[in-house]
Curated annotation (Swiss-Prot):
Role, per record: Electron carrier protein. The oxidized form of the cytochrome c heme group can accept an electron from the heme group of the cytochrome c1 subunit of cytochrome reductase. Cytochrome c then transfers this electron to the cytochrome oxidase complex, the final protein carrier in the mitochondrial electron-transport chain.
GO biological process: gibberellic acid homeostasis
Record organism: Helianthus annuus (Common sunflower)
Disulfide bonds: none
Entry comment on modification after translation: Binds 1 heme c group covalently per subunit.
Annotated gene: CYTC1
Name this polypeptide is given: Cytochrome c
Location in the cell: Mitochondrion intermembrane space
Nucleus keyword on record: no
PANTHER family found in the cross-reference section: CYTOCHROME C
């Protein structure tokens, strides 16, 4: 598997479209927005998995204790259930490196 360092440059505008079509039904990014089926992603970068206040995570997510940043998100978004066995996230992943890079570029700007 290629790493984030080898990924194409991400486009946040394209990433926003990906978020709206594949992620927004379960996640929010705005500060203070509530949780949906998945946790609010505001403040995602630098946060440990399974630690967002007010959201009930699976044991797998809590125990993985990964710190979310470009490399970990890039690997996770390829196949969430393989990266964190037992995760509640039902999304099958983004197989295309460009889509993952675009989504990460958007998340870096929208969750800060």
């Amino acid at each position: 598997m290629a790493s984030f360092a080898e990924a194409p440059a991400g486009n946040p505008t394209t990433g926003e479209k990906i978020f709206k079509t594949k992620c927004a039904q379960c996640h929010t990014v705005e500060k203070g927005a509530g949780h949906k089926q998945g946790p609010n992603l505001n403040g995602l970068f630098g946060r440990q998995s399974g630690t967002t206040a007010g959201y009930s995570y699976s044991a797998g997510n809590k125990n993985k204790a990964v710190i979310w940043e470009e490399n970990t998100l890039y690997d996770y978004l390829l196949n969430p259930k393989k990266y964190i066995p037992g995760t509640k996230m039902v999304f099958p992943g983004l197989k295309k490196p460009q889509e993952r890079a675009d989504l990460i570029a958007y998340l870096k700007t929208s969750t800060a």
